[in-house]
């Protein structure tokens, strides 16, 4: 099945497909009939009303590798995955080297080149989504968290911050720059500094006020068209670093009596990492306050509030002189500062009442502003929609849903009929959808964040003429790789830059584009959206709308159903609708950010475990399959339809030409291969060799069966008895053939040296996983826990670190350390060391028959591997606890390791070995503590004896008989 917990190839990142492995275990333990086992794995999603387990079962063919290297074509490696699926299907059910027909007609077997691709066509028409597997308790937990979130929403107004301070704007009397930058005093009492920004500067603002009892100061950093990106700073990107803020005060009627104002505390609306507000008043010029917190929050107005240690109050009024030092970073200067002064609020009302009043007042201000900028959007339904690969389908809400394959460079082309009115703005909404990875809005599924998209360029033609854009805005923008990801970058004619919403998958976002001149109404609109970067990242669901509003529009995070409410006059707005607007305000206003963050966390559905599955594509969007000359991805020829290998068995006319039909054909009663191949593989598991030795090749290049009549009888009996694997296993192990002694006599070597005629019982080396599990069982450490993600048992350090990225191996603790080998985490590029040493496959391709080698490293592994040392120490502790004689305990250990009692000679040799080891430990020739390992044994057992038992266990675990069956 080529199971692995990672994707393979260079990056070999982790994947979640262990639920399929657990399904296989449950199915085998329940003795699921093999014909049903086949159908559910190949086509469980095509069964009527498939269960979750039947969907999980389709993960069989998701065990293919996935290449996430930056320079590859994902469609090419999807083709390679398909060739792997065809080859695996051929090996597993047909026992044929079908893969040899990928490049040409099979040289030996009756498999046509065309038939290979017809077989591929059955498997090729499937999408490859992740399946969420929520726990039964997840929904109840989610509902409880939603109820908690609603309780917080209901109390938002009660938490609204109130101004303990009454703010006033003093008169700006003077503003100057130490470096001589030009300055203008503006009507709002701010100062605008312009001209070429010096590397460092000291700005001085002098303000006067008649207010008394001043206990704090607020520095506003305002935006202005004269500043780079409107500011608030004078450096190219608009940031600033305020190294130090100092304040002096003097009576208005005695300005020469100024004194320094001691500053107690500083707090800002935003703080750049490493540049907190407190550093603006720490008397250190090499530190400071800055506001670049990422995204589009930089180029906004910000403020810093500084509290005084003592009130400043002069009866005649006060003259304040504020010094703003900018010494920390070149040109990082505030461009348009304004000073406000605060005094304690005299409001006598209860705090709760004041909070509600403040919330309502803020809501009214927001509502007024929102109404002034409200936009009536008209959604456009495309009259035509095409792309390089995905199918674009119009939805009832006028959105467009993309489905199917995507490439690293994809262009959507859509045609719309414009409304009669001139268009002043075009809106592109990126919408979530449950069919998309992580619910979208993008289709990215590898390399980048799942659900991501990257719009490199947006172009619009109106009436055949290109539209020139004036500006663009977005509700949210973030780049998963690189710097900015803004809507403006989607209209800069550079496809390497663009708009993305990484980090907020599963949410709605929008971008608004303003044309230089209004677009003529009634014209035909041709929109092209270019998606692409080093991974496939097309948009999965979107909607295009336009408006004729004078002045255009700006993108904002406002649900579509609320925008029309802003058009309703206040008197006509029903209380319930007004409450919806108030609720939205409370959930988005910056004053309640902390509580909003908690609400968002509570509303988020708990992350469910996932697994990889297949999902048949819709009938209106089948994936075509082509014959590829010489098996080359880049040489597709004519299209082929699903079909089987004619020489095997005809395809019944009543079966559908899809994966379900293929599965039914494979397990049909007249199919000559599936039952034979399956029973042969089971025979191999017990005898070491199949009745057909070449388990993977029943063709002309394979070996003929040693007992053809037996193979035929077993196959027919297997089908007649419900395809029961457990019955077949019981049948084999209870047979006189299997129960023979495996002892080799001289006549065996002469007439049947390889035991092809079954003249004796099987004697074969155990597989790597069984060797490890046998050691765990013998030591008493084996955990019977079933299911769950892969675990990380101990192995030598550095095994995984040599693979790409230096992946760590977080060694499991507790019971997970000693789980069955079946549950060991499998990394394709760095296989578990002990398994690799004992010839286990890496999961890169289907393997019906393992090679068996004998190397010195295998003996060294059994002797020195950290796992076998732990096992021998655990077994030694257990033997030391027992109360029998030395001989009795040796018999116990021998029976546990080799499942038979020792002979007298073996017992004597082992007892002599135990005594000699104990003597060496007593003589300090060996380190008893190191050999015995950690742990205490109750009673009076000396450390030397416990170490001797560990040494004896280690010797038993290194015997050839332990790793050999028979």
Regions found by a protein language model. Give the residues of each.
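Primarily short, surface-exposed interaction patches in extracytoplasmic proteins
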Residues: 2-48, 152-160, 316, 368-370, ...
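Sequence context surrounding c-type heme c attachment/ligation sites in exported
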Residues: 46-147, 350-354, 537, 556, ...
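Extended extracellular/luminal ectodomain segments enriched in beta-structured repeat modules
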Residues: 200, 210-216, 313-321, 419-425, ...
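Short His/Asp/Glu-rich catalytic/ion-coordination signatures at enzyme active sites or charged loops
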Residues: 3-20, 66-73, 122-148, 345-359, ...
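Short beta-strand-plus-loop segments that form exposed binding edges in beta-rich domains
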Residues: 221-223, 323-330, 430-432, 528-535
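Disordered, acidic Ser/Thr/Pro-rich linker "stalks" and the adjacent N-terminal cap
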Residues: 149-152, 162-202, 206, 225-227, ...
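Short coil-to-beta strand junction motifs in C2/discoidin
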Residues: 229-243, 331-337, 438-456, 536-542
């Amino acid at each position: 099945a080529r199971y692995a917990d990672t994707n393979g190839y260079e990056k070999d990142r982790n994947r979640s497909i262990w639920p399929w492995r657990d399904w296989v275990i449950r199915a085998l333990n329940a003795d699921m009939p093999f014909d049903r086992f086949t159908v559910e794995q190949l086509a469980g999603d095509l069964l009527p009303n498939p269960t979750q387990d039947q969907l999980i079962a389709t993960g069989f063919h998701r065990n293919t590798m996935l290449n996430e290297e930056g320079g590859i074509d994902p469609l090419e490696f999807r083709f390679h995955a398909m060739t792997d699926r065809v080859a695996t299907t051929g090996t597993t059910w047909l026992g044929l080297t079908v893969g040899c027909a990928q490049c040409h007609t099979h040289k030996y077997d009756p498999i046509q080149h065309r038939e290979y691709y017809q077989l591929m066509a059955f498997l090729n028409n499937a999408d490859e989504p992740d399946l969420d597997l929520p726990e039964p308790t997840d929904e109840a937990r989610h509902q409880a968290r939603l109820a908690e979130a609603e309780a917080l929403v209901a109390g938002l107004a009660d938490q609204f911050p109130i101004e303990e301070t009454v703010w006033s704007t003093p008169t700006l009397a003077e503003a100057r720059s130490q470096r001589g930058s030009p300055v203008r005093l503006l009507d709002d009492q701010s100062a605008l500094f312009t001209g070429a920004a010096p590397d460092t500067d000291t700005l001085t603002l002098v303000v006067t006020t008649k207010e008394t009892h001043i206990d704090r100061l607020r520095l506003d950093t305002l935006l202005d068209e004269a500043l780079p990106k409107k500011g608030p700073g004078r450096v190219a990107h608009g940031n600033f670093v305020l190294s130090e803020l100092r304040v002096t005060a003097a009576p208005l009627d005695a300005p020469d009596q100024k004194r320094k104002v001691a500053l107690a505390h500083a707090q800002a609306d935003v703080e750049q990492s490493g540049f907190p507000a407190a550093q603006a008043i720490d008397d250190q010029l090499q530190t400071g306050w800055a506001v670049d917190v990422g995204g589009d929050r930089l180029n906004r107005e910000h403020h810093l509030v500084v509290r005084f240690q003592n009130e400043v109050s002069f009866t005649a009024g006060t003259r304040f002189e504020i010094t703003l030092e900018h010494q920390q970073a070149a040109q990082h200067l505030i461009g348009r500062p304004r000073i406000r002064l605060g005094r304690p609020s005299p409001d006598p009302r209860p705090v709760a009442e004041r909070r509600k009043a403040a919330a309502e007042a803020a809501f009214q201000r927001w509502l007024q502003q929102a109404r002034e900028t409200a936009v009536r959007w008209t959604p456009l339904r495309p009259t035509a929609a095409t792309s390089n690969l995905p199918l674009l389908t119009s939805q009832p809400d006028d959105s467009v849903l993309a489905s199917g394959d995507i490439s690293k460079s994809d262009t959507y082309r859509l045609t719309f009929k414009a409304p009669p009115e001139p268009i002043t703005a075009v809106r592109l909404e990126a919408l979530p959808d449950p069919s998309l990875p992580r619910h979208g809005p993008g289709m990215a599924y590898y390399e980048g964040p799942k659900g991501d998209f990257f719009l490199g360029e947006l172009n619009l033609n109106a009436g055949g003429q290109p539209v020139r854009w004036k500006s663009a805005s977005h509700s949210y923008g973030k780049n998963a790789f690189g710097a900015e990801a803004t809507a403006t970058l989607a209209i800069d004619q550079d496809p390497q830059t663009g708009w993305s919403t990484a980090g907020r998958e599963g949410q709605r976002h929008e971008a608004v584009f303003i044309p230089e001149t209004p677009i003529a109404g009634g014209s035909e609109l041709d929109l092209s959206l270019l998606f692409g970067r080093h991974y496939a990242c097309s948009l999965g669901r979107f909607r295009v709308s336009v408006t004729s509003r004078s002045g255009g529009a700006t993108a904002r995070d406002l649900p579509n159903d609320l925008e029309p409410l802003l058009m309703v006059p206040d008197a006509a707005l029903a209380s319930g609708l007004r409450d919806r607007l108030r609720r939205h305000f409370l959930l988005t206003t910056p004053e309640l950010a902390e509580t909003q963050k908690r609400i968002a966390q509570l509303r988020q559905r708990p992350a469910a475990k996932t697994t990889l599955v297949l999902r048949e594509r819709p009938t209106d969007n089948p994936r075509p399959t082509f014959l590829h000359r010489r098996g080359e991805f880049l040489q597709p020829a004519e299209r082929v339809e699903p079909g089987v290998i004619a020489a095997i068995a005809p395809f019944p006319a009543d079966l559908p030409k899809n994966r379900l039909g293929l599965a039914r054909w494979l397990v049909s009663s007249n199919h000559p291969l599936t039952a034979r191949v399956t029973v042969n593989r089971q025979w191999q598991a017990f005898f070491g060799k199949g009745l057909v030795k070449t388990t993977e090749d029943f063709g002309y290049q394979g070996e003929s069966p040693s007992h053809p009549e037996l193979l035929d009888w077993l196959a027919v009996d297997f089908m007649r008895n419900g395809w029961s694997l457990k019955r077949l296993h019981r049948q084999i192990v209870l047979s006189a053939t299997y129960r023979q002694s495996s002892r080799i006599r001289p006549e065996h070597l002469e007439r049947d040296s390889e035991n092809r005629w079954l003249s004796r019982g099987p004697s074969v080396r155990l597989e790597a996983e069984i060797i490890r599990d046998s050691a765990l069982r013998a030591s008493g450490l084996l955990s019977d826990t079933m299911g769950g993600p892969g675990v990380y048992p101990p192995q030598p350090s550095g095994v995984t670190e040599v693979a790409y990225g230096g992946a760590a191996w977080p060694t499991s603790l507790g019971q997970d350390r000693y789980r069955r080998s079946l549950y060991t985490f499998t990394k394709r590029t760095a296989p578990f060391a002990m398994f690799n040493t004992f010839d286990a496959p890496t999961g890169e391709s289907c393997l019906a028959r393992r090679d068996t080698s004998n190397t010195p490293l295998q003996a060294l592994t059994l002797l020195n591997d950290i796992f076998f040392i732990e096992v021998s120490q655990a077994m030694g502790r257990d033997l030391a606890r027992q109360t029998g004689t030395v001989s009795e305990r040796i018999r116990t250990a021998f029976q546990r390791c080799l499942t038979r009692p020792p002979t007298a000679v073996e017992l004597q040799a082992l007892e002599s070995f135990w005594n000699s080891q104990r003597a060496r430990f007593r003589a300090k020739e060996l380190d008893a503590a190191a050999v015995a390992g950690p742990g205490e044994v109750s009673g009076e057992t000396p450390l030397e004896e416990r170490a001797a038992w560990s040494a004896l266990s280690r010797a038993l675990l290194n015997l050839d008989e332990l790793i050999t069956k028979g």
